[in-house]
Amino acid sequence: MRVGVICFANTCRSPVAESLLVRFLAGEDGIEVFSRGVAGGPGSTPEAMLQALTQNGLSLVSVSGEQLVNDDLNADLYLFMERSILREAVVRNPSMWPKSFTMREFARRAQLNPPERDSETFAEWLAVVHSTRRREELLGTDSEDDVRDPGLGGDLEAFSAMISELELLSHRVAQLLTGWPSK
């Protein structure tokens, strides 16, 4: 199973979520997690974020600023940090829609449709989770499902809050990704 975690520049939120998912999925065979940005490029990690990571006993698996490209379109699940970023990716690549969610949305919808690992595959379950959605939900500016971006000017408190939120979400998501039969 391939899981992509996507934010804007791939220098803050998605690398943190990737690192947390890798930590929570340690020992689980067959799951690859990667992070990308929709506007990736060389970027540096803000100093306040590095301090927040250290205070939380975390380190990053990768910080590349790498952009989402066609080679990444074979993932089984995409978890976005914001609805606007999800919308942009789906406009560029409509085939991503059934397997693309904001991280918060995925955790919420999955809780309403718990997996039945002994009677369905991950892809079948994901189709059930997706079936209650409408494309129109991508429109608008509601940020309810967004993970707030502290940005390059964010302070230690803002990055610590982001890390705490992503830790909770990553733990929930990791529980949903484990225990599936091998293909």
Could you describe each region identified by the protein language model?
Residues 90-183:
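Phosphate-binding/catalytic loops
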Residues 1-75, 84-98, 171, 175-183:
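Conserved active-site segments centered on acidic
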Residues 82-83, 104:
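Short secondary-structure boundary segments
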